[in-house]
Regions:
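Active-site pocket-shaping loop/turn-to-helix segments
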Residues: 1-19, 36-46, 71-76
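Phosphate/pyrophosphate-binding loops at sites that engage ATP/ADP/AMP, CoA/4′-phosphopantetheine
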Residues: 5-29, 54-61
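Generic hydrophobic alpha-helical scaffold/packing signal
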Residues: 7-10, 48, 52, 82-85
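A glycine-rich phosphate-binding loop feature that marks nucleotide/adenosyl-phosphate handling sites
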Residues: 26-33, 100-105
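Extended hydrophobic secondary-structure segments that form protein cores and membrane-embedded regions
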Residues: 28-33, 64-68, 127
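A glycine- and small-aliphatic-rich helix-loop capping segment at beta-alpha/alpha-beta transitions
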Residues: 44-55, 143-148
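Conserved catalytic cysteine-centered active-site region
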Residues: 48-80
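Conserved beta-strand-centric core segments of catalytic alpha/beta enzyme folds
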Residues: 74-167
């Protein structure tokens, strides 16, 4: 179940990096995998339960983003990975599609923090990817402040030439 995967990931991150889930919740964007298919069960119920189980009361402080309302269901989850990384890079989280003043969210969402789009103080991105046959992958990515150029172009070009077999 998604909840056990999320809880295990966060527990490992807490142990390895000394973070605390309740403390990082206000700085976390959860990029949902929800397919907007509640009539077929969707994944919303599992994701809601996972956030609440893993973060407790702090779940309402995690900002939730989703791309499928804009892109449909792609054959891979790469779009969502890019959204997560770009949200960390720029501090801008895309809105939930059609989430405006007339939007009536599912009552099961309660007080969960659905993104209206814009600036959010995100430092962590929690990403769920799921596939047919109960394949589940989840990542927790942390923003690392840039300190100028990360790649030495001369070294990179030399490596590319070496790999490609050119002088």
């Amino acid at each position: 179940h998604v909840a056990s995967v999320m809880d295990r990931l966060l527990s490992q991150a807490e142990e390895r990096f000394g973070i605390r889930r309740q403390e990082i919740a206000p700085q976390t964007v959860f990029v949902s995998h929800e397919t907007y298919t509640p009539a077929r069960g969707g994944s919303a119920a599992a994701e809601i339960a996972s956030l609440r189980q893993s973060f407790g009361e702090a779940a309402n402080r995690v900002v939730i983003a989703n791309t499928k309302g804009f892109t449909g269901h792609s054959m891979g989850v790469g779009i969502e990975d890019v959204v997560a990384v770009k949200a960390l890079e720029h501090g801008i989280v895309p809105p939930i599609a059609n989430y405006d003043d007339d939007f009536e969210p599912d009552p099961d969402l309660g007080d969960l923090n659905l993104s209206r789009g814009g600036q959010y103080p995100v430092q962590y991105a929690l990403r769920l990817g799921a596939g047919f046959g109960s394949q589940i992958a989840m990542t927790l990515t942390r923003q690392i402040a840039g300190v100028g150029e990360r790649i030495d172009r001369t070294v990179h070009n030399r490596w590319v030439a070496d790999v490609a077999g050119y002088d």
